[in-house]
């Protein structure tokens, strides 16, 4: 009898042990399929645009209702951009070539101040169109490196006819280009190639960086985003600091941080489209006085790539995976993210001893 009870207890213990092993195996498989990505970079590098692309590429994109919710943001971004240009005309002592536009400018500020936030009335839109087409305004816009202006200014102001129409609903591209400062941490979840991604977008302005630290533990990879086009610009929060130099300092502190010895670093050199337009007019020596190459896209972009990759102090142990990106180009981001995922899968297999 005692023997039978002992056998039953042993059998029960064995079943329990088997279940625990199975649960542990399943938990391990789930953990292996979970990928935590930390999206880092200085302010206005394009991180939030990449998050929006993940929604478009790996989820269902933005519904009609969601796009409608972005209409006030589009209007606000457009109005604020034109305000920034006209204010800069005063600072840079640029006159309106057509003197009647000075009255339009005063009227524009009055109407914009009185309008509800995110509203664009027909009267306001017509004044904005006249101002935007004025040659003094265009001259000031071409000198935008001398003041703070959103990258999307020309995109929206060139589209005034379309966005001012009654019943306007922002397109996916309009939504991608909206600019709202990220504060705190935004988490996005999606699945791709049998992996479950958690993407953390962290505020890039200096005042936000202290909030990053508790995201660090257990991160699979860091995607560090740099605005290539920032090489001739200064920070919004510190007009003595060049944006590219600030990005390099931040990258150095992340890449060589003791917490990230085992963490894959993926470098997105972003806004390559704006950089390509800018580099022929604004030399790279503004940021890197020692640069002796030509001011063409390929040479200049590769020089910046080398400057960042050379900051890696553990080249023998750690590889930087660099990609040139345009965050507003869905096809480009889809292609690059596919390559990034393959690197993550390969590194996961290496960690498991299967590669």
Curated annotation (Swiss-Prot):
GO annotation, biological process: adenylate cyclase-modulating G protein-coupled receptor signaling pathway
GO molecular function: G protein-coupled receptor binding; G-protein beta/gamma-subunit complex binding; GTP binding; GTPase activity; metal ion binding
Cellular component aspect of the GO annotation: cytoplasm; heterotrimeric G-protein complex
Region annotation (G3 motif) ranges: 197-206
Residue numbers spanned by region G1 motif: 36-49
Binding residues annotated for GTP, in chain numbering: 41-48, 176-182, 201-205, 270-273, 327
SMART domains in the cross-refs: G_alpha (SM00275)
Stretches the record annotates as G4 motif: 266-273
Residue ranges, annotated region (G5 motif): 325-330
InterPro entries according to UniProt: Gprotein_alpha_I, Gprotein_alpha_su, GproteinA_insert, P-loop_NTPase
This protein's UniProt keywords: GTP-binding, Lipoprotein, Magnesium, Metal-binding, Myristate, Nucleotide-binding, Palmitate, Transducer
Record: residues binding Mg(2+): 48, 182
Subunit comment: G proteins are composed of 3 units; alpha, beta and gamma. The alpha chain contains the guanine nucleotide binding site.
Function: Guanine nucleotide-binding proteins (G proteins) are involved as modulators or transducers in various transmembrane signaling systems.
PANTHER family reported in the protein's UniProt record: G PROTEIN ALPHA I SUBUNIT, GTP-BINDING PROTEIN ALPHA SUBUNIT
Similarity comment text for this entry: Belongs to the G-alpha family. G(i/o/t/z) subfamily.
Record-given protein name: Guanine nucleotide-binding protein G(i) subunit alpha
Species of the source: Homarus americanus (American lobster)
């Amino acid at each position: 009898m005692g023997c039978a009870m002992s056998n039953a207890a042993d059998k029960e213990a064995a079943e329990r042990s088997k279940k625990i092993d199975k649960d542990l195996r399943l938990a391990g498989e789930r953990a292996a399929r979970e990928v935590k990505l930390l999206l880092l970079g200085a302010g206005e590098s394009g991180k939030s645009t990449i998050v929006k692309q993940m929604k478009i590429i790996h989820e269902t994109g933005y519904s009609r209702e969601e796009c409608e919710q972005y209409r006030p943001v589009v209007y606000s971004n457009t109005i604020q951009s034109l305000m920034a240009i006209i204010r800069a005309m005063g600072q840079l002592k640029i006159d309106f070539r057509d003197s009647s536009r000075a009255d339009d400018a005063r009227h524009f500020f009055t109407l914009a101040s009185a309008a509800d936030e995110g509203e664009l009335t027909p009267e306001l839109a017509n004044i904005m169109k006249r101002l935007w087409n004025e040659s003094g305004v265009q001259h000031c816009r071409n000198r935008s490196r001398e003041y703070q202006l959103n990258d999307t200014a020309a995109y929206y102001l060139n589209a005034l006819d379309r966005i001012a129409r009654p019943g306007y609903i922002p397109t996916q591209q309009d939504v991608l280009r909206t600019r709202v400062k990220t504060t705190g941490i935004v988490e996005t979840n999606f699945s791709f190639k049998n992996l479950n991604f958690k993407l953390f977008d962290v505020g890039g302005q200096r005042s936000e960086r202290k909030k990053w630290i508790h995201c660090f533990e257990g991160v699979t990879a860091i995607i560090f985003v740099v605005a290539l086009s920032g090489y001739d610009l200064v920070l919004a929060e510190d007009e003595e600091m060049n944006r590219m130099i600030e990005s390099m300092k931040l990258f150095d502190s992340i890449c060589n941080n003791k917490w990230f010895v085992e963490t894959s670093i993926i470098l997105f050199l972003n806004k390559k489209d704006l950089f390509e337009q800018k580099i022929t007019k604004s030399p790279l020596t503004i940021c890197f006085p020692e640069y002796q190459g030509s001011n063409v896209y390929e040479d200049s972009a590769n020089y910046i790539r080398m400057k960042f990759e050379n900051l890696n102090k553990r080249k023998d142990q750690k590889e930087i995976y660099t990609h040139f990106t345009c965050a507003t180009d869905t096809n480009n981001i889809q292609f690059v993210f596919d390559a990034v995922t393959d690197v993550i899968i390969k590194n996961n297999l290496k960690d498991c001893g299967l590669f």
